[in-house]
Amino acid sequence: MAEPRWVERLVVEAVHLDQLREHGGLSGLRDENALESALARAHQKWQYDSRARFPELVAASGFGIARNHPYRDGNKRTGFLAMAIFAGLNGYALDATDAEVVTVMLGLAAGHLNEQELADWLTSHLARSK
């Protein structure tokens, strides 16, 4: 697989701030290392796991944000949008209802859904953009 286009930290930070403005929540970074780790997760998977499929990279791009809680608030929203942006940058769109997204992201943040299960869900919800 050719190297994907990655979501930059500044984009994730802008998305996070936008979500807080739109939906409310506590601002601020809770854990710098958790954010750095979350942002590097997909790239590390691509670099060191030659069998990684694109949905697994998408899952990795949001998993660390939703699960590691680098921000004081808005981690699930930011994690989901990081996945959607990453997919979009690479020619894919996420096709899921709001209810499906909420269920998946709540399950992910609560530890009821692991990264591979998220990737499996994404496999059936990613479509090539037109």
Regions found by a protein language model. Give the residues of each.
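FIC/Doc superfamily catalytic core
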Residues: 1-130
